[in-house]
């Protein structure tokens, strides 16, 4: 089992699919990495030699921000927005959508489950 960027890549999967298990690597980035390293994307992870795995590992470490570094950068960007008090930062602070979506209805993913209002007493 190949281990790249602290992630165990699944056995028996194609290389381009297996690379997407790394946080920050999608299909397009995976194909770009494989194109740069010269590894055929149709091969299985099990079929790669140690040299090819090291080549992929080196490419990811040098030219791509993945896993912990990427998570840290994203959270620091959000924290910066909240600290400067801009509109997007305020929306993050309040747990509301930050990109202009409506909130009268919908937005339940961001707002969480409904909080019911007590009905009128008789």
UniProtKB/Swiss-Prot annotation:
Name used for this protein in its record: Small ribosomal subunit protein uS13
GO cellular component, one term: small ribosomal subunit
Known role: Located at the top of the head of the 30S subunit, it contacts several helices of the 16S rRNA. In the 70S ribosome it contacts the 23S rRNA (bridge B1a) and protein L5 of the 50S subunit (bridge B1b), connecting the 2 subunits; these bridges are implicated in subunit movement. Contacts the tRNAs in the A and P-sites.
Family: Belongs to the universal ribosomal protein uS13 family.
Gene Ontology BP terms: translation
Gene3D superfamilies, sorted: 1.10.8.50, 30s ribosomal protein s13, domain 2 (4.10.910.10)
MF annotations from Gene Ontology: rRNA binding; structural constituent of ribosome; tRNA binding
PROSITE patterns linked to this entry: RIBOSOMAL_S13_2
HAMAP family: Ribosomal_uS13
Keyword Ribonucleoprotein listed: yes
Matches recorded under PANTHER family: 30S RIBOSOMAL PROTEIN S13/40S RIBOSOMAL PROTEIN S18, SMALL RIBOSOMAL SUBUNIT PROTEIN US13M
Self-association state and partner proteins as the record states: Part of the 30S ribosomal subunit. Forms a loose heterodimer with protein S19. Forms two bridges to the 50S subunit in the 70S ribosome.
Key words of the record: Ribonucleoprotein, Ribosomal protein, RNA-binding, rRNA-binding, tRNA-binding
Residue segments, region Disordered: 89-122
